[in-house]
Structures are given as C-alpha cells and as structure tokens.
Amino acid sequence: MLTKFTDLARKLPSPVYKVAAQAFIDLNFPRHIFIETTAACNLTCEYCPREKRNDHMDFQMFKEIINECSQYGARSFSLHLFGEPLLYPKIMEAISYIKAKNKRHTILLTTNGTVLNKFARRLLESRVDRIIWSWRRLPTEFSSETMEVLKRIGMVRILIEETPKEEFERWSKFPRVEVKHLHNYGGQIDTTKWGLESSNGDRYPCYHLWLAPAIRWNGDVTICCNDPKGSERVGSYGKDGFSIGTYWTGNHLARLRTSHMNNEVKGLCVGCNSYKAYPDIFFNFQKKDGHK
C-alpha cells in the first residue's frame, strides 16, 4: 500500500493525487499496519534513536494481530519498526502465516541487508511483495541470490547523507532506486547537521493518522512508525479489549486527527518532520470543516 502511495505522489498532479490518496483511507480499519516483529538489530548507526534491546514479539500475539486484520479484507504489513526483521527467529513463519490468512495481503520488509544472503532464496519463495534495502553506504559484494532478490522484488533506499553520488549509477538496473533524506523520527535526532530542515514552516496533516498505526514488539500500539521510545502509546494489544480496531475508531485518534487538521499538533508530532515524506493529502476545505 505505501509503495502505491509513493507512486501516486510521484506521478499525479496535486488535485488528482489528493483524491486518489484519500481513496486509500479506511476509517473502519487501517490499510497498512507496522508490526515490530523484533527490537533486535545488528548495527549501531549513530543517528538511530532505537532502544538498545533484543526482544522479539511473541508469535501467538503476532498471529492474533494478523487474525484481526484479516477480518477486514486485504491489508498490507511492514514487519519492522526499529529492529532488523530478518533477526526475528520466526520471520519466515510470520510471512507464511500472513499469506495463508489472505493471499491478497501484501508484505513489506525493510532490512539493512546484512543477513540478506542467508535468507535470499527463502524470501524469493515466500511471496514477499517488496523488500526495501535501506542503507547509508552500500556494500560492494552480494551473492547471486541476493542480487536476484533485489532485481525481482527489491527496492534500494539510499540515504544521501552518507552515500557518494557516484554510487547511485550502479543501482540503475534495479526496479526501483529511492534516494531520500533521513527524517528526524519525531524530533529524536538532529538532521540539521546534514543541512536538512526540521518541522518548521507550514505544516499539514500527517498521513500516518489516517493510514498506518504501529505495534511495538511488546504489543504497545502507538500512533505511527516514528515513535522509537513508544512515547505516544495508546494501549496494549489484547489487554482490556484493546485492539487495532478499537483504537482506529476510538475518540483518542479522532481527537488527534482533528488537531492535525487544525494545525494544533501535540506531543511527539511537534518536532517531527516525517509528514513531509508525502505531499498533503487533504484539500483546504476539508481542514476548515475539521474533517476526521
């Protein structure tokens, strides 16, 4: 779903883009769900605000999340937040479970690529829909199977703060190469040292509140994928009747959406610049009406 969203932003003029983007919104249940299968990571990037822990999501909880989502038809899933998803001991079982529940579900994996050689053949056979390899500086050696993965279902994401421009050319043979700036993860890291803007200036509503909540490894549900410390936790999955559905249709999220429409953001959103990842999806008249 999010890759389609990116395509819309790149290809369509603004009014058409807004209409098309809003067609992705489902006020009954989110179209896309971020699931942190693991908090573990084998890198220590200086800019990363992740908590340094190696916990994994309980697989029974994972299945319960997928079961709930599957009641609402085809959905898309990112199986990561701040950990490396290929370090999740049950990552292949997780992928298989999603596809078994609904073959039209789509799966996105964002990986640092360090263990991709080990999983390349199984990922090709698993029906993963998209793999994003996100790197600050790309390695020079790959196995033939890894190259096949990247060519068939991969997207290479290069953070231009760290990758020399001369390296971009050699990635032109892949289906998609995305060059993007590092964002500040809810104001948790200082991106101004790379000459990037903070969240200052005219804001517009963040798409995450209408499209994609996040579930941390321990079941904590937070408003989006840019909350490394879980500071915007809204509930714990499966406890006291709390679910993705109850959050998505509840008063808390309705108030958050209204505050964004009124340009009155609070909490983690105040210093965040990730809303700039996509153009504004709403028309001015909707904001004046306090669209929810």
Task: Give residue ranges: language-model regions.
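Short cysteine clusters
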Residues: 41, 45-48, 206, 224-225, ...
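Conserved alpha-helical substructure of the radical SAM core
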Residues: 2-131, 279-292
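A broadly conserved sequence feature marking short terminus-proximal activation segments
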Residues: 1-17, 226-241
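Short, acidic, Ser/Thr-enriched surface-loop or helix-capping motifs
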Residues: 215-218
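Conserved AdoMet/S-adenosylmethionine-binding subsite of the radical SAM
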Residues: 88-210
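C-terminal accessory region of radical SAM enzymes
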Residues: 152-197, 226-277
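Processing junctions and N-termini across compartments
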Residues: 35, 39-42, 200, 263-266
